[in-house]
A protein has these predicted regions:
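Short, P/G- and charge-enriched loop/turn segments at secondary-structure junctions
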Residues: 15-21
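Metal- or metallocofactor-binding catalytic centers and their adjacent structured scaffolds
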Residues: 7, 34-104
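Hydrophobic residues within beta-strands of alpha/beta enzymes
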Residues: 38, 148-150, 202, 247, ...
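Flexible C-terminal active-site loop/helix
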Residues: 1-12, 23-28, 279-336
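A generic structural signal for well-ordered alpha-helical segments
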Residues: 101-102, 167, 218, 267
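Metal-dependent enolase-superfamily TIM-barrel catalytic cores that perform enediolate-based chemistry
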Residues: 111-221
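Conserved, mostly hydrophobic/aromatic
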Residues: 31-33, 93, 106, 177, ...
């Protein structure tokens, strides 16, 4: 059962800035395994490129047989064949196999998981780093989304001016993601200010390597701290549980739905809040992730909303709440 794959360039509607970079386009890899759809959106930050993804897909292509009965076993076999730093490659294969498996059962993935899609929390819509005027314009354009996630982390002074202006413009639920861009003293000052602005939580305030800083910040923070870059897979959670209030799970960094489900179980055992997030992705990966929505507290599944040329259609939003099609598999079809 060969893996068919193709590279697709996602064009962003607007330049998308985070603390580390600004992008106008993103290359992803779409795969098809016997009618099962998957997607890889690789990140150099986690050790992958388009070339490593396509090379690794070719290496395992002939190892996937069409007659598998036990999906967890099959995904485990494929994981063992891939290099360690191949999370988005594994994620693409993982979601394609779930798509095949649930199509054979003629049920959507959420029914296989055993959850009610109506119980998904509302998703945030992300405002990337830009000039204050442009960020305020983006807030206006996002009128239909009740929860906004604001990207910060390049300059703490400018960050707080932007947040003050955004809060003056809207009373929506606001979340902040610094992508590890602040130093400890900056983070303390910023979080104090953000608490006054009634921000819900702050995501990854410090660099993932600043463990001592994160431990100190956890003790004094006036807002809940959600960790993203520190938490890649389930085994990372026990190491970080003592200095965060919650975690951000992404299929592209953990390796797919199977590992995401393990992460949810481990995080709950440690009493942590859970968010399902995303990279810039098409509706293939976003919709696959949305099936996990009823299991978590927060969603940030807007990657497909930031692109102008999504080649697939699947989950949509109504007042910020995911609406997952009642279709077999991961509930995605090519856009007409």
């Amino acid at each position: 059962m060969a893996i068919k794959h193709s590279v697709y360039k996602l064009q962003l509607i607007d330049p998308f800035g985070i603390a580390r970079s600004t992008r106008t386009e993103i290359d992803v890899v779409h795969i098809n395994i016997d009618g099962g759809l998957g997607e890889s959106s690789p990140s150099k930050y986690y050790g992958e490129t388009i070339k490593t993804v396509t090379d690794n897909l070719d290496k395992v292509s002939d190892k996937i047989k069409p007659d598998f009965e036990f999906i967890e076993d099959k995904i485990g076999e494929i994981k063992n064949l891939l290099p360690e730093n191949s999370p988005s490659t594994l994620a693409a294969i993982d979601m394609a196999l779930y798509d095949i498996f649930c199509k054979k059962l003629n049920i959507p993935l959420y029914k296989f998981i055993g959850v009610d899609p109506d119980k998904c929390p509302k998703s945030s819509f992300t405002i990337g780093i830009d000039t204050m005027d442009i960020m305020l314009q983006k807030v206006d354009k996002a009128a239909q989304y009740p929860v906004l996630k604001i990207k910060l982390g390049r300059d703490s002074s400018s960050d707080m001016k932007v947040m003050k202006a955004i809060r003056e413009k809207t009373n929506k639920t606001l979340r902040v993601d610094a992508n590890g861009g602040w130093k400890y003293d900056e983070a303390v000052k910023c979080i104090n200010h953000l608490a006054d602005l009634e921000v819900e939580f702050v995501e990854q305030p410090l660099n993932r390597d600043d463990i001592d800083g994160l431990k100190k910040l956890y003790k004094v923070s006036k807002l809940p701290i959600i960790l993203d870059e520190n938490i890649r897979v389930s085994t990372d959670i026990p190491k970080c549980a003592e200095f965060c209030h919650g975690i951000n799970i992404k299929l592209m960094k953990c390796g797919g739905i199977s590992e995401a489900r393990r992460m949810i179980a481990v995080a709950r055992a440690f009493g942590l809040k859970i968010m399902i997030g995303c990279m810039i992705e098409s509706s293939v990966a976003i919709t696959a992730a949305s099936h996990l929505g009823p299991l978590v507290d927060y969603l940030d599944l807007d990657g497909h909303l930031l692109i102008a040329n999504d080649p697939y259609q699947g989950m949509i939003f109504k007042d910020g709440k995911p609406i997952i099609p009642n279709k077999p598999g991961i509930s995605v079809v090519p856009r007409a």
